[in-house]
Structure formats: structure tokens, C-alpha cells
């Protein structure tokens, strides 16, 4: 407890009072490289506290964080379908090809069915893009 008291009562105030904070706007332009380096640690601490507060209290940040933790690839496209499959007719394809949209295929860009296991684990409905010759 004594070390914490020493930190709060003596060390931290001395550190903050010795920071090269200029008195005017023009003073910021006169700071040396060493002075700018001395200002980096407190700036990082303030930015970290601000970012933590943003994540804790901003509803948009909370929604974005919870959406990425779901493990889903597809969070909004045709969610009412059990599997999203698009067929595109292209004359240059020899017969037909299935292209991966889940980024989990070992044979990417071709689909190897990896989305099936992904869909079971996450409840997602992603499927391949099937391209066939007409």
C-alpha cells in the first residue's frame, strides 16, 4: 500500500509536472524531438482510457463487437434462406465451377464444402457461388 501511496502522491505528480507542455499554441512548434517523445506515453494512456470508455458506453461499439464474436460470415444477406447460393451463367467456363464465399476452403477460390461445417457450428447460411456454362 505504501508503494501505491508513493506513486500517487509523489512519483506521478512529479512526472506530470515535468512534461514539456507549452504555454501557447506556438510553443507546440518549438518542441524538440526529445520533448515529443516524452509526450507519447501520457498520450497513449489517455487514448487507451478513451477507447476503453468508448467500448464500454457506446451502444454502436457494443453492437459491432458482439456481431464479430458470433463467428458468422454472413450477417445480413438473405438470412431467411437456409443456404445462400448464387448461380451465374458464364460462357467461358468449361462446364461448371463452384467458388468459395466463406473463405474457409482449403482449395480456395474453389469451394470444397467447408461452409457446411461452418454453417453447423455458427448457424450461418453461407454457400458457394456456382458458375456454369450456358
Curated annotation (Swiss-Prot):
Q: Which GO terms describe its biological process?
A: intracellular iron ion homeostasis; mitochondrial transport; regulation of autophagy
Transmembrane feature ranges: 36-58
Ranges of the Cytoplasmic topological domain: 59-134
List residues binding [2Fe-2S] cluster. 100, 102, 111, 115
Please indicate if the UniProt record lists Metal-binding as a keyword: yes
Q: Which Pfam families does the record cross-reference, listed alphabetically?
A: MitoNEET_N (PF10660), zf-CDGSH (PF09360)
Residues in compartment: Lumenal: 1-35
List GO terms (cellular component aspect): endoplasmic reticulum membrane; mitochondrial outer membrane
Query: What Gene Ontology molecular function terms does this protein carry?
Result: 2 iron, 2 sulfur cluster binding; metal ion binding
Organism domain of life? Eukaryota
Task: Classify the protein's membrane topology as the record does.
Answer: Single-pass membrane protein
- Cofactor(s) needed: [2Fe-2S] cluster
Relay the cofactor remark from the entry: Binds 1 [2Fe-2S] cluster.
User: What subcellular locations does the record give?
Assistant: Endoplasmic reticulum membrane
- Keyword terms: 2Fe-2S, Endoplasmic reticulum, Iron, Iron-sulfur, Membrane, Metal-binding, Transmembrane, Transmembrane helix
Protein family (similarity comment): Belongs to the CISD protein family. CISD2 subfamily.
The family database entries (PANTHER family) matched by this protein are listed as: CDGSH IRON-SULFUR DOMAIN-CONTAINING PROTEIN 1
Put simply, this protein is called CDGSH iron-sulfur domain-containing protein 2 homolog
List the taxonomic lineage: Eukaryota, Metazoa, Ecdysozoa, Arthropoda, Hexapoda
Amino acid at each position: 500500500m505504501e508503494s501505491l501511496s508513493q506513486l500517487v502522491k509523489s512519483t506521478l505528480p512529479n512526472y506530470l509536472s515535468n512534461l514539456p507542455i507549452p504555454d501557447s499554441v506556438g510553443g507546440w512548434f518549438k518542441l524538440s524531438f526529445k520533448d515529443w517523445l516524452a509526450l507519447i506515453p501520457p498520450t497513449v494512456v489517455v487514448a487507451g482510457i478513451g477507447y476503453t470508455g468508448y467500448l464500454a458506453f457506446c451502444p454502436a461499439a457494443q453492437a459491432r463487437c458482439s456481431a464479430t464474436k458470433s463467428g458468422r460470415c454472413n450477417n445480413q444477406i438473405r438470412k431467411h434462406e437456409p443456404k445462400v447460393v448464387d448461380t451465374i451463367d458464364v460462357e467461358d467456363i468449361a462446364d461448371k465451377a463452384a467458388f468459395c464465399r466463406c473463405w474457409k476452403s482449403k482449395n480456395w477460390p474453389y469451394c470444397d464444402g467447408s461452409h457446411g461445417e461452418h454453417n453447423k457450428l455458427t448457424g450461418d447460411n453461407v454457400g458457394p457461388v456456382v458458375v456454369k456454362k450456358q
